C-alpha cells in the first residue's frame, strides 16, 4: 500500500509582502452617463409698442395754410394752398427768382 500526501500550495520565497503594489497605470473606461437638465421657468417681460399720435390740424382742399403754425413760402413769397403756380418752386432749383404766386 502506498502513502500519498496531498499537494501543499506553493508559498512565496522570502518574506511575505505587507502590501501588493504594481507600477502599471490603472485606466478604466466607464459607460457614458446621460443627464437631463430641465431649466426652471423664467418670466421675461417684453415692452409693448409705444403708440403716439401727432395730430395735425390740416384740412384738405381748404384755403387755409397747409402748415400749422407757419406759412409756406418760396424765398419769402407766401404760398397759399388755394392753388399756386408750380413754376415758383421749380424755378428755385433752376437758379431763377421766384415770382409771386
UniProtKB/Swiss-Prot annotation:
Keyword Nucleotide-binding set for record: no
Give each disulfide bond as a residue pair. Answer: none
**A GO molecular function held by the record:** structural constituent of cytoskeleton
Alphabetized Pfam families for the sequence: Keratin
N-acetylserine: which positions carry it? 2
Q: Which family does it belong to?
A: Belongs to the avian keratin family.
Q: What's the protein name?
A: Feather keratin Cos1-1/Cos1-3/Cos2-1
Organism from which the protein derives: Columba livia (Rock dove)
Amino acid at each position: 500500500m502506498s502513502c500519498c500526501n496531498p499537494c501543499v500550495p506553493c508559498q512565496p520565497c522570502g518574506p511575505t509582502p505587507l502590501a501588493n503594489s504594481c507600477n502599471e497605470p490603472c485606466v478604466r473606461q466607464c459607460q457614458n452617463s446621460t443627464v437631463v437638465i430641465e431649466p426652471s421657468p423664467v418670466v421675461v417681460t417684453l415692452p409693448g409698442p409705444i403708440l403716439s399720435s401727432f395730430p395735425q390740424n390740416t384740412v384738405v382742399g381748404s384755403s387755409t395754410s397747409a402748415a400749422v403754425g407757419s406759412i409756406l413760402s418760396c424765398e419769402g413769397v407766401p404760398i397759399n394752398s388755394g392753388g399756386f403756380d408750380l413754376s415758383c418752386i421749380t424755378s428755385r432749383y433752376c437758379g431763377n427768382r421766384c415770382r409771386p404766386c
